Amino acid sequence: MRKLILTAAVLALATPAAAQSTGTPVFAAPYRAFRASELGLSLSDPGSGVALEGFYKVGQKTWDLGVRGGFWDTDGAGTAVLLGVDGRTRAVTHSESFPLDGAFTLGAGAVLHDNANLFMVPVGLSLGRRVDLEGSTVSFVPYFQPVLTPVFGSGNSDMLFSIGLGADIRVQRDLDLRVSGALGDMDGISISAAFLH
């Protein structure tokens, strides 16, 4: 009976969380921040509990490909394992007629918890523009990212829509700080640090 209650609680908590491949409110700016690769950590509040994830991304021609993994402490319902892969490719370049740059995003991931496993395939478009601060090496990218996410597994399926709002802040040549939040079928906030190579 206890496993059934925990399974139901995890499904209820995890179903709305579908921003990126692991269901946390970590979103992507339309730009590649790194030259060759990046390694980082994300701490997020996906609506219930706290999630901690590590990530690694590389650039492959026009695509950025990454893996992420971590844990989500779901406020009394146990700890879920988070696993995902993400991709991003540039789709729009700003012009006189359209002021934003854009990137197509695609992911696949899982929230694994005892018998309550959820799988996600988020598809989105990130739109934003880099702002360089005059006389400084600091720059930032404010962006928004609508995401449509099919969610399935453990007898549960849904189609979720959310909008991520975020800013990537380049504080040094090899360090990005990132903040994002979600609106829509999910909510939550995240902060990340990425070490750029």
Give the predicted meaning of each segment.
Residues 49-60, 65, 69:
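Outer-membrane beta-barrel translocator/receptor signature
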Residues 20-40, 44-48, 60-62, 73-77, ...:
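Outer-membrane beta-barrel transmembrane domain signature
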Residues 1-33:
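Cleavable N-terminal export/targeting peptides
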Residues 1-2, 67, 128, 177:
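Short, intrinsically disordered low-complexity segments
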Residues 84-86:
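Extracytoplasmic beta-rich ectodomain segments of secreted or membrane-anchored proteins
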